[in-house]
């Protein structure tokens, strides 16, 4: 059985105005068996219009954009089978993947702008 260790960190982008915001991620380290489903929680505190992002950093590589939400359909499809759902009433943008692979081992970052 292969296990995935997925460290999860939060990131905040600065706004152009003075309103405060923050991001919190529920899962700081996740260990999963290969083919298990993954859900990483991300909540933000900001009442205005937001742009939401998930980034991934694979071992030894640079940070790369996994998916983003600006407006429209709240279910966002990303690369490599990842998706995230924007739920405005809960201030959440949770990342999901129905079946993780060993190659998904990485650090995942939720961000709001």
Swiss-Prot record:
Principal location class: membrane
Glycosylation sites: 43
InterPro entries: Ig-like_dom, Ig-like_dom_sf, Ig-like_fold, Ig_V-set, TCR_variable_region
GO cellular component, one term: T cell receptor complex
Keywords: Adaptive immunity, Cell membrane, Disulfide bond, Glycoprotein, Immunity, Immunoglobulin domain, Membrane, Receptor, Signal, T cell receptor
The keyword Iron belongs to this UniProt entry's keyword annotation: no
Keyword Glycoprotein: yes
Biological-process GO terms, alphabetical: adaptive immune response
Extent of the signal sequence: 1-20
Disulfide bonds: 42-110
Compartments it resides in: Cell membrane
Residue ranges constituting the Ig-like domain according to the UniProt record: 21-113
Assembly with partners or alone: Alpha-beta TR is a heterodimer composed of an alpha and beta chain; disulfide-linked. The alpha-beta TR is associated with the transmembrane signaling CD3 coreceptor proteins to form the TR-CD3 (TcR or TCR). The assembly of alpha-beta TR heterodimers with CD3 occurs in the endoplasmic reticulum where a single alpha-beta TR heterodimer associates with one CD3D-CD3E heterodimer, one CD3G-CD3E heterodimer and one CD247 homodimer forming a stable octameric structure. CD3D-CD3E and CD3G-CD3E heterodimers preferentially associate with TR alpha and TR beta chains, respectively.
Function according to Swiss-Prot or TrEMBL: V region of the variable domain of T cell receptor (TR) alpha chain that participates in the antigen recognition. Alpha-beta T cell receptors are antigen specific receptors which are essential to the immune response and are present on the cell surface of T lymphocytes. Recognize peptide-major histocompatibility (MH) (pMH) complexes that are displayed by antigen presenting cells (APC), a prerequisite for efficient T cell adaptive immunity against pathogens.
PANTHER family: T CELL RECEPTOR ALPHA VARIABLE 8-1 (PTHR19367:SF31), T-CELL RECEPTOR ALPHA CHAIN V REGION (PTHR19367)
Protein name: T cell receptor alpha variable 8-1
Organism: Homo sapiens
């Amino acid at each position: 059985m292969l296990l995935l260790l997925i460290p999860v960190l939060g990131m905040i982008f600065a706004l152009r105005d003075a309103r405060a915001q923050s991001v919190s991620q529920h899962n700081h380290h996740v260990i999963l068996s290969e083919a298990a489903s993954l859900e990483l929680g991300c909540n933000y505190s900001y009442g205005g219009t937001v742009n939401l992002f998930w980034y991934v950093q694979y071992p030894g590589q640079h940070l790369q954009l996994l998916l983003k939400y600006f407006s429209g359909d709240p279910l966002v499809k990303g690369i490599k089978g990842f998706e995230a759902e924007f739920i405005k009433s809960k201030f959440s943008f949770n990342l999901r993947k129905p079946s993780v692979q060993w190659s998904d081992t990485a650090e995942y970052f939720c961000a709001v702008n």
